[in-house]
Amino acid sequence: EQLAKACPKGVDIYYENVGGKVFDAVLPLLNTSARIPVCGLVSSYNATELPPGPDRLPLLMATVLKKRIRLQGFIIAQDYGHRIHEFQKEMGQWVKEDKIHYREEITDGLENAPQTFIGLLKGKNFGKVVIRVAGDD
């Protein structure tokens, strides 16, 4: 409901990096000719079996067909790794110019890294996750 209120005109581009319930919430909001670049499915990285419930593939395929949605997977390192230096230069400049904003969740101590990583896979954070192993002194 909140997503539908936030996107009253629907969704034209959905960058898929999570999958699962997030994708389920976005699917009915996709507009005709929407585009979905798929870079990851973090919600299912630890899955050892199919999720419970009905098979949702027919709904996905019907939606892709009826709305003429373009769905394309890509792996950044393989597809764009050759442009890493260009990216670092441009992104670094944009961050300096305050054109790019991001959230950081900092956890102190290497001993907390395993639990923080598990939380990342379960969607318990928002933004960039950092493990601080030493102070800034």
Language model feature labels by segment:
Residues 1-137:
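Terminal helix/beta-alpha structural elements that buttress the NAD(P)+-binding lobe
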